[in-house]
Amino acid sequence: MKLIREFYSRDTIVVAKELLGKVLVHEVNGIRTSGKIVEVEAYRGINDKGAHAYGGRRTPRTEALYGPAGHAYVYFIYGLYYCMNVVAMQEGIPEGVLIRAIEPIEGIEVMSERRFKKLFNDLTKYQLKNLTNGPSKLCSAMEIRREQNLMDLNGDELYIEEGKNESFEIVEAKRVGIDYAEEAKDYLWRFYIKGNKCVSVLKKD
């Protein structure tokens, strides 16, 4: 069952934590890939120095964040890679959740071909570990690109659905790659499923 709009229209931290264990799905050209969300980061917009919309910054790139909750915000980094966020809160409040890592469920052969141009059984241990354990890696594996920016997650192409009813421990950690964000770099707004092998960066004790 797909997540309804009201799921996303809540406090961003709550949405981030509750996205763990849910299933990200992308259906394109008759090919379905999916994966359990195992790591996320929350970004709280105007007052968050780590966020793209800090200080009320509003550009064509960040416009999706100002739109209705339950839409995709997909952006390009380093001139090479895409990252996918889920827009949260209410329209006009530019907050979102970065999907950092997934555990593949469906279409793993397709993911392998997209990431490494190899059959899944031919992947090295390193490639297996790095199939979807990062925001740009999962976008490459699931073919999430600029075309999916602003996409309604209540549609039939890119969406998130309920996962299995399972219990797990959530780890709270610092977000990755925002050392410029002054005090915001220390916020424990990265959340991941403890013990999952697909998490990108483990918390240092």
Swiss-Prot record:
GO BP term (any one): base-excision repair
Protein name stated in the entry: Putative 3-methyladenine DNA glycosylase
Family: Belongs to the DNA glycosylase MPG family.
Primary enzyme class: hydrolase
NCBIfam families xref list: 3mg, PRK00802.1-1, PRK00802.1-3
Lineage: Bacteria, Bacillati, Bacillota, Clostridia, Eubacteriales
One Pfam family this sequence matches: Pur_DNA_glyco
Gene3D superfamilies according to UniProt: Methylpurine-DNA glycosylase (MPG) (3.10.300.10)
Any GO MF annotation of the entry: alkylbase DNA N-glycosylase activity
Enzyme Commission number(s) of this protein: 3.2.2.-
Key words of the record: DNA damage, DNA repair, Hydrolase
Keyword DNA damage set for record: yes
